Amino acid sequence: MDDVLRPVWRTYDPRFEANAVAHVRAGGHAVMRGAARWWLLLPSDEGMIPELTAWAMLDLGVGGFDEVESGPAAGLLRVKLPKRLREHVMDWCERDGGHATSLVSEALDCRACAMCCRKNRVQLEPEDETRWADEGRAELSGEAYVRESRGRRVLRVLRGDCVHLRGNDCGIYALRPDNCRAFPAGSEGCLSARAER
C-alpha cells in the first residue's frame, strides 16, 4: 500500500478568487464558477505542470491552458472548462468536500480495476518498441496494436479499452510501455474507479 499526496478539488465563486488562489498555491485544484463561464485554476511548478495536475487534465480531455500573467493568480494555470465537463469536476469537488486542507494523503492499494488501461491515450516511446523487438515481440509495433496520432505512435484502443487489456489484466504486462509504468496511483481516473466500486 502506497501513500499518495494528492490535490483536493474545491469550487469557488470568482468573487472569492483570493481564497481559490491560496488553495491552489498550497497544492489544491480550484473550479471557478462564474455566471457565464467556468474555468479551472491549477498549480504550476515554475512553468511545469505537476504530475497529478497533468493527469487530471488528461482525464478531462482538456489540453489547452494559459499561464496567468498578472494579478493574484500570476504563475498559476487557467483552463477553460466546457459545459459538458462541469458535472464531472463537481463530482470531484463533492468527493473532496470533507477535506480541510489543499492536499490530502491517501493510502492507495491497487485494486486491479484496470482504470489505468481505460480511456487513456498511451504514447509510445522509441524505447518501448525497441524493448518489444529485443524480446522477440516485434509484432506489437504493428498496425493491429499501434496507430499514428498527431505525429506520435500510440497504442490502439477498442471501445475505450487498451488493445492489450484482457478483462482487468494487461496482456503484455512485463513489456508494457514506459508511459503505462508511469501512470500514477491517485489520478482522477484511479480515484473515480475506486469510488464506483
Specify the residue positions occupied by each region the protein language model found.
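Hydrophobic scaffolds flanking metal-cofactor catalytic centers in soluble metalloenzymes
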Residues: 1-197
